[in-house]
Amino acid sequence: MSPDEQLELLRRFAPTLHFDALERWRPGLVDGYLEHSTVLDGDKHVLPGTPPAEAAMREHRHNYNAQLNPLGNDLNLNTYRRSTEMLESYGREQDLAGAGIAYGRVVPVGRAFFLQYWLFYPDNPCVLPPGRHDGDWELVQIKVEREGEGFAATQVTLAEHGKPATHPVEASRRGEGPSVFVAVDSHACYFKQGAHPALLSDVCDPAGERGAKPALALLPIAPDKRDWVHWAGRWGLDRGGGTRLAIGLHLKPTPWPLTELNKAGDSPKSPAHQGKSWRSPRVFAGEGTVRKWSTVQLQRLAHLIGYATWPKTSPRVEVRPAAEVSGTAASTYVIEAGSAGHFLRRVTFVSVAFFEQLPDGTRRGLGLQRVRPGQAGTFGIPHEGELVWRAAGYNVLRQRGNPVPDRHPQAQAQ
């Protein structure tokens, strides 16, 4: 099916969105949001090249710990995202009588097609902290099947706070898109207006508005997946610590990337990282099962593996000028490491990083050297200024133990 045919099918069955009379936002283009955003690596470090954020998202597309900082606002300014500046920067001049923009995706499964309408909101201003975050992705999914020479909608699935709810389409309405009611602030989608049970009640009272269909654009999926659809980070800053409340403690950082998943809080992941809704729309609609583990299950397993294998003992490491032993130049050093740990926690190699202390107080990296416990190696490390080194031991699973503090090479024997 060509892109034009996909858009035609998406337009025909596009949902009619009904918004609460007090709703301030409509789903919009991602471009305006990314144009004013920086990308953070973890909680603080700003990745280079931002804003705009899109280039950094492509470069760091596998960084699960990254998060968008909309408009570069201060991490502690919880009220900033409600300010006039953010509204104007995002393009608040949008027509609130309309239904905004939806990003479409068509997934063929047998003789049926699953039409996905991804809706992006720049803000999720819930009352309680666990639900308060920047950036918000919502999904409306419609299954259409061939009927004679055309198509007919047979079921609709809405992601109500991530939990899919599927309803069949009445026979009299199979040739059109469904009506969807959007809750104020949370933007969760429902089949009926009124109050709906949630952490706090979700409410949608359109006050007699007839609703409207969103404009449509296909999700910009690149062949090499270097796009914001597949970016592994989160679409906003943690405002309320919702993930920590739900999942619990985070262990020490390790080379296992899954131990850092969800660290940015409860802001959403990109569409391609939202589990079975992307991976298997049929399963998301309740038509089957998927055997792949969920992100949370993988994270918990990684935590257990990390806790069971993390080498808590620092190895004994010595660095001394090689001239003590063989009379070679002072820029050649012997590195010797002792054994540490046991079983899976046993240190299998030691990595030593060397730095040159410059006159202005900064340091210049000179590279890494590796040695095995119980062995010694001789390495050439040219330098002019004072030499500083630090070391850390790694086990067989490449998990790093407690690092050895910064030290200087032992004095040369007289």
Describe each PLM feature range.
Residues 1-136, 148-318:
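A domain-level signal for the mature, folded cores of soluble proteins
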Residues 311-328, 338-340:
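Short, compositionally biased P/S/T/A/G/V-rich stretches that sit at domain boundaries
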Residues 351-355:
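Beta-strand signatures of extracellular beta-sandwich domains
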Residues 360-369, 400:
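Surface-exposed loop/edge segments in extracytoplasmic proteins
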Residues 385-396:
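Beta-strand-rich modules
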